[in-house]
A protein has these predicted regions:
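Glycosyltransferase donor-sugar binding loop
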Residues: 119, 150, 173-188
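Nucleotide-activated donor-binding/catalytic signature segment of Leloir-type glycosyltransferases, i.e.
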Residues: 187-206
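A short, well-ordered alpha-helix in the C-terminal region of glycosyltransferases
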Residues: 49, 136, 279, 286-300, ...
Length: 317
């Protein structure tokens, strides 16, 4: 592993330094293939690989930047970056079908293909022993309905709406798993959640290495994001047999079959979110049916082994 000076935020000078470092690296190492990810780092890596004469360049899009910002100049910059880098990209992959269609429709890449995301079913699965162990450690009785969210603690994951919605879901606890990255910006979601007035029904669990066990101990998974690629956390929850309540946005709406494996709600609307959560908290039979259907869907579509094999095949490896 080689660390390079990459910045997630827009910073022309920082990006120029990163580009130079990448060109130097590629000219030194002479790779046969460069496979890039994410909007800014993916743009820089592909352009640097082209400049350095790397024979094969691939890219996996985890969500187009221009689809996620309402700022018109940023949308234009995001599209221009993808369009330019698309000219030098031999293999163009996306994690969602919708993004692949966007890439083809917007002339970013005529050959864009969705490979999806995947997780390991041997790690994420229903686990009665883990459920008992985690609930015992947290002092949560078996009959308590637990809603869990696993994500970075940032505003665009929908925490403001979730905090308000949970006030109207009195018969359930909310477990929040995750933390902020140093590079994350925006308000303090810990403070926002604590101020929601949920009292003992809120558990901020922070960063955990036992996410599979935490999911197995929960009853409902929620992810009210404003934008996503194809969230791994939803796949993990589905493999664990949890019904999923998510927002009707790119990514989750490909994963969740409304009424069959979970429920979709409009982004940014706490009332709809509360209604969906109440529908599930009050109906254990529905939770079990949706969870089982979601697990079957995840095993078919999001098994890590299948996703990796498809990716390697498309990369010619």
């Amino acid at each position: 592993m080689i660390a390079l000076p990459l910045e997630r935020r827009l910073s022309p000078m920082a990006h120029w330094r990163a580009f130079q470092a990448l060109v130097t690296l590629f000219r030194t190492e002479k790779p046969d293939l460069v496979h890039a990810h994410m909007p800014i780092s993916g743009f820089l890596a592909r352009m640097a690989a082209w400049w350095a004469g790397v024979p094969r360049i691939a890219y996996t899009c985890h969500g187009f930047w221009f689809n996620y910002t309402g700022n018109l100049p940023r949308q234009a910059i995001g599209y221009l970056m993808e369009f330019l880098a698309g000219r030098v990209t031999g293999v163009f992959l996306t994690v969602s079908d919708e993004e692949a269609r966007d890439a083809r429709r917007l002339w970013i890449s005529r050959h864009a293909v969705s490979v999806r995301n995947g997780r390991d079913p041997a790690v994420f699965h229903p686990d009665a022993a883990a459920r008992t162990r985690i609930r015992s450690a947290l002092g949560v009785p078996e009959d308590c309905v637990v809603v869990v969210v696993v994500s970075r603690l940032v505003r665009h994951k929908g925490y403001p709406e979730l905090a308000v919605a949970m006030r109207d879901v009195p018969d359930a606890e909310l477990w929040v798993v995750g933390e902020r990255l140093e590079s994350d910006r925006g308000g303090d979601m810990d403070a926002l959640l604590r101020a929601a007035g949920l009292g003992d029904r809120l558990r901020l669990l922070g960063y955990r290495t036992d996410v599979a066990a935490i999911l197995a101990a929960a009853d409902i998974f929620v992810l009210p994001s404003h934008f996503e690629g194809l969230p791994m956390s939803v796949i993990e929850a589905m493999l664990t047999g949890l019904p999923v309540v998510a927002t009707d946005i790119r990514g989750p709406r490909e994963q969740v079959v409304p009424g069959a494996t979970g429920l979709l709600v409009p982004a940014g609307q706490s009332r709809s979110l509360a209604e969906a959560l109440r529908r599930l908290t009050g109906n254990p039979t529905l939770r079990a049916a949706m969870g089982a259907a979601g697990r079957m869907r995840a095993l078919d579509m999001y098994d890590e082994t299948k996703v990796v094999a498809r990716t390697l095949d498309l990369l010619g490896l």
